[in-house]
Amino acid sequence: MSKTLSLQLPWVEKYRPQVLSDIVGNKETIDRLQQIAKDGNMPHMIISGMPGIGKTTSVHCLAHELLGRSYADGVLELNASDDRGIDVVRNQIKHFAQKKLHLPPGKHKIVILDEADSMTAGAQQALRRTMELYSNSTRFAFACNQSNKIIEPLQSRCAILRYSKLSDEDVLKRLLQIIKLEDVKYTNDGLEAIIFTAEGDMRQAINNLQSTVAGHGLVNADNVFKIVDSPHPLIVKKMLLASNLEDSIQILRTDLWKKGYSSIDIVTTSFRVTKNLAQVKESVRLEMIKEIGLTHMRILEGVGTYLQLASMLAKIHKLNNKA
């Protein structure tokens, strides 16, 4: 690969795992996939979990290990959020399933449906028959955020694997590998900021790392929060723990609201900060989270005003005074 092309390639693609052993987190599920690769007989499967934790990548790694050199011809990947309708099942998927290929003995073609929970009910119903007719030659892998949006008849035909959110340690491990390979200048608070904003989403973490390097060169907390354009947690923490309500409201108005952060930005960062407020008693912290949650609910209902946030701070200030 030329240096120019390497620079243009997003790091999330450049450092995408190629084998199952390279995937971080969800060890038990990855162990099951490695056993499937070893046995050589892949069942239909549904992999569910939040975005950016390696669901689709895991299926590609499994396909690489099962099909070897036949991978390019033997795998069809469709993003079901784009190709959602019944025509895709009748045309692309059916034609691929009918196609004759010379694969290693005992191996099957693989159809990967990313974001399968976005498929229409009609398309999912049509897929039932296709799966039955071509199960001898083709296996299906569904990657989705919510497995309950896959119709019951498809679920009953599949092994269901659930991926949990990646831990901060898992995300940090992969970031440090990339930082070493790319010779990135960073500070510890910069890494903490990337992990904080990613919330267990590896894809988001790697994209934020590359964006910060491209935009500022140095990965520190201030640069990361400028890139991701979310409220700085230290400012939010100061707002939540201010000794009097007037100071809290002043921080909200001057450092957050007037700088253009939305109600959702402020309330979600407040939630993440509050979860980790070790200096606040757990009982008080839980009440604070409850108030933040109620405010979040009102904002999602369409009342995302400054007044809602000020009311939230007044209630949190009252809780802090009781403590």
Curated annotation (Swiss-Prot):
SMART domains given in the database record: AAA
Predominant location: nucleus
Listed GO CC annotations: Ctf18 RFC-like complex; cytosol; DNA replication factor C complex; Elg1 RFC-like complex; nucleus; Rad17 RFC-like complex
GO biological process, one term: sister chromatid cohesion
Listed GO MF terms: ATP binding; ATP hydrolysis activity; DNA binding
Keywords: ATP-binding, Cell cycle, DNA replication, DNA-binding, Nucleotide-binding, Nucleus
Superkingdom per UniProt: Eukaryota
Keyword Transferase: no
Binding site for ATP: 12, 24, 49-57, 145, 203
UniProt key word tRNA-binding: no
Subcellular location: Nucleus
Subunit structure: Replication factor C (RFC) is a heteropentamer of subunits RFC1, RFC2, RFC3, RFC4 and RFC5 and forms a complex with POL30/PCNA in the presence of ATP. Component of the RAD24-RFC complex which consists of RAD14, RFC2, RFC3, RFC4 and RFC5 and associates with the checkpoint clamp DDC1:MEC3:RAD17 complex. Component of the ELG1-RFC complex which consists of ELG1, RFC2, RFC3, RFC4 and RFC5. Component of the CTF18-RFC complex, which consists of CTF18, CTF8, DCC1, RFC2, RFC3, RFC4 and RFC5. RFC4 interacts with ECO1.
Further remark: Present with 2760 molecules/cell in log phase SD medium.
Described purpose of this protein according to its UniProt entry: Component of ATP-dependent clamp loader (RFC and RFC-like) complexes for DNA clamps, such as the POL30/PCNA homotrimer and the checkpoint clamp DDC1:MEC3:RAD17 complex. During a clamp loading circle, the RFC:clamp complex binds to DNA and the recognition of the double-stranded/single-stranded junction stimulates ATP hydrolysis by RFC. The complex presumably provides bipartite ATP sites in which one subunit supplies a catalytic site for hydrolysis of ATP bound to the neighboring subunit. Dissociation of RFC from the clamp leaves the clamp encircling DNA.
Family to which the UniProt record says this protein belongs: Belongs to the activator 1 small subunits family.
Annotated protein name in UniProt: Replication factor C subunit 4
